[in-house]
Regions:
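Core catalytic lobe of class I
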Residues: 3-274
Length: 274
């Protein structure tokens, strides 16, 4: 069956308003995470400009804490979720990638908009950098004797700021309720709701999909799950500067699991085009 891919250069909120109600089978997206300046109004030029500044003054993304972030994300995602709720068919799924720190805002927005939170999928990976920072540079600026500084640095040499190395991204699995219909009756009416477990995963391709998706072989327990590596330079493309590119294999897996052949899949946020 030929694949019909259509790309629209538009504000996603405004474009989604033009879609017919109950016309979408699956929404699968990697939205702005609203961490630091990475919100719905973020500028690539502004973000790239900050990277040229000092590492200490301008901390890496995700290390600054602003209580307004979660409120801004919730408000924006509630508006989006309420709009998508009308466009999805009953039993249609809304899958949203997020960060562990702000996942709750996305899940709550989907819930309040009317969706059922059916599950959370964890995409686990090990190719990540530690974010916790040493406090040595702060101690060196403190008003105390050189000897006291040396002693304090030694005492806290193994302590870092409270950012645990992140090795997973959560995916919120929300579903538009099917009302009083059974899943099979809803399936016959809309071709949505039931999951396609025909694809087998794991090392031996003999396991049904789980809610943990890993990037590599950890041990026997993790081997039972679906292994998906982060995309390398070849898959990303030479000119792709997007900071959170998702693997094609991961997106393919989710589309096959949560939709059928011929389904209409919507991604409100283009990102790098995965």
């Amino acid at each position: 069956m030929p694949v019909n891919i259509q790309i629209y250069n538009s504000d996603c909120i405004e474009y989604i308003k033009t879609l017919d109600d109950n016309s979408i089978d699956l929404v699968l997206t990697d939205p702005p995470y609203f961490i630091d300046k990475l919100d719905n109004k973020w500028s690539s030029d502004e973000i790239n400009g900050e990277k040229k500044n000092s590492h200490i003054k301008h901390l890496p993304k995700g290390m600054k804490f602003d209580k307004k972030q979660v409120k801004k994300l919730y408000d924006y995602y509630l508006e989006l979720s309420e709009l998508l709720f009308t466009k999805l068919k009953p039993g249609g799924y809304f899958l949203s990638f997020s960060s562990p720190r702000l996942y709750h805002a996305i899940a709550m927005a989907c819930d309040i908009a009317g969706f059922e939170i059916r599950d959370m999928i964890n995409w686990n990976y090990t190719q990540s950098m530690p974010k916790g920072m040493s406090v040595t540079h702060i101690i060196n600026k403190m008003d105390m004797s050189p000897e006291d500084k040396v002693n304090l640095i030694e005492e806290y040499k193994d302590f870092k700021t409270p950012q645990i190395r992140s090795c997973f991204e959560p995916i919120c699995v929300a579903m538009k309720p099917i009302g009083k219909l059974t899943f099979i009756k809803n399936e016959l009416n809309f071709k949505t709701g039931l999951l396609d477990f025909s694809q087998k995963v794991g090392i031996g391709n003999d396991r049904v999909p789980a809610n943990i998706i890993t990037t590599e072989e950890y041990n026997e327990t993790y081997d039972k799950n679906f292994l998906v590596s982060k995309p390398g330079k070849r898959e990303k493309g030479e000119n792709n500067t997007h900071i959170t590119v998702k693997p094609i294999a991961l997106i393919e897996h989710l589309i096959k699991l949560f939709s059928k052949k011929g389904s209409t899949v919507l991604d409100p946020f283009l990102g790098s085009g995965t």
